[in-house]
Amino acid sequence: MAISRRSLHAIILTVLLLAATAAPSQSGSRSRSRRKSERQSTNRGRDNNSIRGGVAQTPESSPLPALDLTPQPPMEKEEPDTLAPRASRDAPGTPKVPAMPGVTPEPSGNASEPADPAELRADLRGLKGSSDDPNFYVCPPPTGATVVRLEEPRPCPELPKGLNFTEGIAVTFKENLAPYKFKATMYYKAVTVASVWSGYSYNQFMNIFEDRAPIPFEEIVDRIHGRGMCLSTAKYVRNNLETTAFHNDADEHEMKLVPAESAPGLHRGWHTTRLKNNPTGSAWIHRHGTTVDCIVDEVEAKSSYPYNEFVLATGDFVYASPFFGYRDGSHSEHNAYAADRFKQVDGFFPRDFGTGRRHGSPVTYNLLTTPMFTVGWNWAPKRPSVCTMTKWREVPEMLRAEYGSSFRFTSNALSATFTTNLTQYSLSRVDLGDCVGKEAREAIDRIYLEKYNNTHLRVGSVQYYLATGGFLIAYQPLLSNNLADLYVKELMREQALKPEERKLNATTDGKVITTTSSVEFARLQFTYNHIQKHVNEMFGRMAVSWCELQNQELTLWNEAKKINPSAIASVTLHRRVSACMLGDVLAISTCVAVPAENVIMQNSMRIPSKPGTCYSRPLLSFKHVDGEELMEGQLGENNEIRLDRDAVEPCSVGHKRYFLFGAGYVYFEEYTYSHQLSRSDITAVSTFIDLNITMLEDHEFVPLEVYTRQEIKDSGLLDYAEVQRRNQLHALRFADIDTVIKADPNAAIFAGLHGFFEGLGDVGRAVGRVVLGVVGGVVATVSGVSSFLSNPFGALAIGLLVLGGLVAAFFAFRYVMRLQRNPMKALYPLTTKDLKHPSEGGGGEEAMEDFDEQKLDEARSMIKYMALVSAMERTKHKAGRRGGTSAILNARLTDMVMRKRGAKPKYEALPETDEDI
């Protein structure tokens, strides 16, 4: 049976102690000073008990007296001290010196005294040793009725580990969610038919019909890409009826393509018409107008696996494969339209409408007509334009380990573990997977040259494995340069592949590998493998070490059982037994426990009847239960009571022994009991081997995503936000939304006059321009006045002006009437005022008599000259305002005439006083 290393060392120590009985050792566990003090204390006790020469004088024939541990009264004569203290369950931390007859024992160093640090330490040591078994065991000699044997060595397990650990370079591939993207061009004519009701001052749409018509192949090739022109008519079929729309309801003619308004994030576009035809005419008449806008719009197209259709950025679906054509077997691709709706042009030179030039290199151009538009795109073969797999991560250090029927690829850089089968995955099974081998070889070659070119060798070719979760792993095994022989073995394994198997793999139908959107399972697998590897290696090493240790210790057990069979049998059977060798087996008998208080030790190991011979183990007296008679025996090993007292040896000088007695030890010196010790008083040498377990190392996880947000966004064919954005920007790019056409009732008249004069030829056009200009000016003036009067603020202003004019006319009329009645009073109101109020000193008649006729004539002349001066100043002022030369000359001529007219009657100054007259 398996035992611990500590038990084995205990057996070895027991063997050493047995060997020491034949050659007594002079060593002890205490220092010289302590042994000296103990020896002095012991000698004082011996002197009090009449022990001489260190040998107790015990009559050989005298029977053993009654055993007791209580102190005996002093004796008058010398008696042999035959009793040692009784083994008890007292705390071993307080050892007692045996009380001899007639002697009061001295207090020992461990006696109860006031608080002392040494005593506290002793008590603690006593508590530590109190857990040992204090019982004694009586083991009868085995008779052979029960025999046992030791088990044979067991086979030890192997460490759980992976097989064929291989390092290498790996490139992981995932499912390609991104659709195939290419540039396409839409050709169509936007047809708008509007029905307008014209009122006198307003227009009202009665109906607006909008439609899209595809452009024929010939017009696209010859006119649009040939000359950058487009026809003004649109011929298309609706409800199985062929119809034709004419731009501006005029005859067919060519229109030039002009660039559309640019918008951020959109491709280029061209069209022919910015303003739509809105028919207007005389009031209260229904009119209809047609607009045809030829549009060439570059858009982005997308197609996803299996590439049977594609969708344009406008949201329009085309139910044909982008790889359909008439070259290289592409006619087998899907096409849901009739044959006459598709045309493939070889050697086509497309026109760049931005620069007006045609491309220098020819292309194969596909044209497909749908009911609403014609779409064109550059044809390309399906292989290698698309690939169902795309490269995910490059792993320079990938470890491959074989676990059972699977490979586990572990990468610390990714913190992930991928599980695959042991068999390789053929690339021929991947539909449209040509890019996998090419990209894998390029990445592996680059990593190998950068990192492993001088230290490792490649083992065979690149291997491919399909991992759980839909990841395809391209793995290149590597070997260090000193393992070239393994490289040769790997080459032999590669060459051992049967040709039939290779042919079978090459003809396997291809399929698409579906990859999960999350890699958390690989992260969990990596975590589990990381913990499993650490735990399994730790416990595996422990199991192997434990097994090997048991097998090695079994040899020691077989040898130790020959020396002390009882100890080996007791430890093995986990109970106290007595054993002896019967050939190659152990005969055992069960030991009976004896309470410690029923065991008494004698304090002398000398044999009185045989001088020079002593017992090698102390003598005991015991009884199984209280009330029975005492039985004699000898202390054996490990508290065993031997019923025979046959353990003797020649007496030697300087004898010192420690014997396990109950829960402590007893010390004999010169074959005489000295004192008792606790187990804690003896320094223990530990045989325990510490188990050094390595703690689990820390590992940080890094974020790892299979598909980015942009890849997930691009995985769908239709982007609702992009479609709505493009459709709402269509009106801004291909129409003028800022120009406003208002209702004009005279537009019909002008249109009729314009048509009339246009029919008269060049002369009619010239006359028509003059007539239309004059009529337009008159109409504009009348319209302006009419619109001003129709405005409430204008009418209010006119009313205020009229009212102000009436008030001014009234005051002017009054002034004129005053001038007619009394000009002087009107002109000189202050002068005439004195005439109405004469001076207080004179009467009226006398005043009238003061007027002189000559002075009156002079007054009349003065008034006349004042009128002339006023007229000259007005003429000069008007000439200055006009600022012209003719006006200035006219003013001067007028001045000369005025001066000449007034030359005869010269003006003379009036005298200052009446006396001067």
Swiss-Prot record:
InterPro entries: Glycoprot_B_PH1 (IPR035377), Glycoprot_B_PH2 (IPR035381), Glycoprot_B_PH2_sf (IPR038631), Glycoprotein_B_ecto_C (IPR055341), Herpes_Glycoprot_B (IPR000234). Residues 23-792 are virion surface. Glycans are attached at N48, N110, N164, N421, N453, N505, N692. A proteolytic cleavage by host furin generates two subunits that remain linked by disulfide bonds. It holds the Pfam family Glycoprot_B_PH2. Residues 1-22 form the signal peptide. Residues 737-790 are annotated as: Hydrophobic membrane proximal region. One of its GO terms (biological process) is symbiont entry into host cell. It is a single-pass type I membrane protein. Residues 196-202, 281-288 are annotated as: Involved in fusion and/or binding to host membrane. Keywords: Disulfide bond, Glycoprotein, Host cell membrane, Host endosome, Host Golgi apparatus, Host membrane, Host-virus interaction, Membrane, Signal, Transmembrane, Transmembrane helix, Viral attachment to host cell, Viral envelope protein, Virion, Virus entry into host cell. Gene3D superfamilies: 1.20.5.1890, 2.30.29.100, 2.30.30.1230, 6.10.250.3280. It is found in: Virion membrane; Host cell membrane; Host endosome membrane; Host Golgi apparatus membrane. Residues 21-117 are annotated as: Disordered. Residues 814-917 are intravirion. The chain crosses the membrane at residues 793-813. Homotrimer; disulfide-linked. Binds to heparan sulfate proteoglycans. Interacts with gH/gL heterodimer. Envelope glycoprotein that forms spikes at the surface of virion envelope. Essential for the initial attachment to heparan sulfate moieties of the host cell surface proteoglycans. Involved in fusion of viral and cellular membranes leading to virus entry into the host cell. Following initial binding to its host receptors, membrane fusion is mediated by the fusion machinery composed at least of gB and the heterodimer gH/gL. May be involved in the fusion between the virion envelope and the outer nuclear membrane during virion egress. This is Envelope glycoprotein B. The lineage of its organism: Viruses, Duplodnaviria, Heunggongvirae, Peploviricota, Herviviricetes.
